[in-house]
């Protein structure tokens, strides 16, 4: 089993709620040291590949978020879709 791939899937599934380090350990059946290494390795993969997402740690939870460098594009998307909602 590729734990890195499973972790990525877990972060996708939990969405905005995020997931605690303890829960990651429980689900993957690993200790905190290995969980932190996997999170770090996955973040490095996102950075190396210049991906549009990253791992954020907010309110005691890890989750996938978009990169701040791309905010102007996300704002255009929100602006464009908000205008079509009234049709």
List PLM regions with ranges:
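Short, leucine-enriched amphipathic alpha-helices that occur as contiguous helical runs
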Residues: 3-8
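Short amphipathic alpha-helical elements of helix-turn-helix/winged-helix folds
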Residues: 9-13, 45
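Short capping segments at the starts of secondary-structure elements
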Residues: 14-20
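A short acidic, leucine-rich amphipathic alpha-helix
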Residues: 21-26
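N-terminal interaction modules that seed assembly of large macromolecular complexes
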Residues: 27-30, 63
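Short amphipathic alpha-helical interaction segments
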Residues: 31-41
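Short basic alpha-helical hairpin corresponding to helix-turn-helix/winged-helix-like nucleic-acid-binding
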Residues: 44-87
């Amino acid at each position: 089993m590729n734990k890195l791939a499973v972790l990525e899937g877990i972060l996708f599934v939990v969405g905005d709620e995020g997931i605690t380090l303890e829960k990651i350990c429980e689900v993957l059946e690993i200790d905190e040291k290995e969980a932190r290494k996997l999170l770090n390795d996955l973040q490095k993969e996102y950075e190396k590949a210049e991906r549009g997402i990253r791992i954020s740690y907010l309110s005691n939870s890890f989750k996938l978020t978009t990169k701040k460098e791309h905010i102007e594009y996300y704002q255009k998307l929100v602006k464009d879709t908000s205008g079509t909602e009234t049709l």
